Amino acid sequence: MGNEFRVCDDCQATNVKTLIPKLKKVDSCATIEVGCQSYCGPGRKKSFAFVNNRPVAAPTEDELIVKIEAKLNK
């Protein structure tokens, strides 16, 4: 089973236009779902994505990608 990324296109700290290409570089075969994730509180302040149904957040997109890569390499 492949990885799954879920991101919000409405949260203030998440820029879907730049985040999705970065996620595709991490795993080009992953499923990417865009839409409200009901994670609005943290989503106002931090960039985030759900990785295989687990939330991962960081102050910047680049830090988020590092955390996602670490999570997938466990």
From Swiss-Prot:
Disulfide bonds: none annotated. Pfam families: DUF1450. InterPro entries: DUF1450, UPF0741. It comes from the Bacteria. Signal peptide: none annotated. Belongs to the UPF0741 family. This is UPF0741 protein BA_5632/GBAA_5632/BAS5234.
